[in-house]
Design a protein with these regions (language model features):
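Hydrophobic "anchor" residues on beta-strands that sit immediately upstream
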Residues: 1, 75-76, 157-158
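N-terminal "arm"/small-domain region of PLP-dependent enzymes with the aminotransferase-like
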Residues: 1-29, 34
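Conserved donor-binding loops in enzymes that form glycosidic bonds
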Residues: 6, 102, 138
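Phosphate-binding glycine-rich loop
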Residues: 28-76, 90, 100-102, 174
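Nucleotide-sugar donor-binding loop of glycosyltransferases
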Residues: 75, 81-82, 102-104, 163, ...
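Conserved coil-to-alpha-helix start sites within the AMP-binding
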Residues: 83-88
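Structured binding elements
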Residues: 95
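Active-site phosphate-binding strand-loop segment of PLP-dependent enzymes
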Residues: 106-178
């Protein structure tokens, strides 16, 4: 059973899609180029930011963030237990340990109460350094950034928004991914 008729959506836009694909293939600028620059400009404007740096996929984007902040071996990265593997795979590739926290059943997003309990548990155990929290805008539902942000501030943790599923959604008037 098809949930969404992708073929009908393609047929409705087929001329425009095919023409743009042919134009891009003919230009042979697959990495960088004017299409990427245009995309980054438009996405930055859409989410209300000056800049946007696009990546090949969300996994690469998260890995760049982890690397930029020096997250690696011995570090704990807290994330919801209901997410796509890409939310934590890059942290694991760099040697960090994911700590899975419960979700709220009404939003499927990171439960701030569970997050704080897991942070306290990791601190009490003493084998990992709490470093970051990955909040996922699961199925387009923004996480509770005010509460999660306050917890991150309290413990000195980096808050990373995994907005791969949240493009177009807003939290308190701010676009996800901004």
């Amino acid at each position: 059973m098809e949930f969404i008729d992708l073929k009908a959506q393609y047929r409705a836009l087929q001329g425009e899609i095919d023409a743009n694909i042919q134009r891009i293939l003919a230009g042979a600028h697959f990495i960088g180029g004017e299409e990427v620059a245009e995309f980054e400009e438009k996405l930055a404007a859409y989410v209300g930011r000056k800049h946007c740096v696009s990546c090949g996929n969300g996994t690469d984007a998260l890995q760049l963030v982890y690397m930029a902040y020096g997250i690696g071996a011995g570090d704990a990265v807290f994330c919801p237990d209901m997410t796509f593997i890409a939310s934590v795979e890059p942290a694991c590739m760099l040697g960090a340990a994911p700590v899975f926290c419960d979700i709220e059943l009404d939003t499927y997003n990171l439960d701030p109460v569970s997050l704080e309990a897991h942070i306290q548990s990791v601190l009490a155990e003493g084998t990992l350094r709490p470093r970051a929290v990955v909040a996922v805008d699961f199925l387009g539902n923004p996480a509770k950034y005010d509460e999660i942000g306050a917890i991150c501030k309290k413990y000195g943790l980096l808050l990373i928004e995994d907005a791969a599923q949240g493009t177009g959604a807003s939290y308190k008037g701010k676009k996800c991914g901004s």
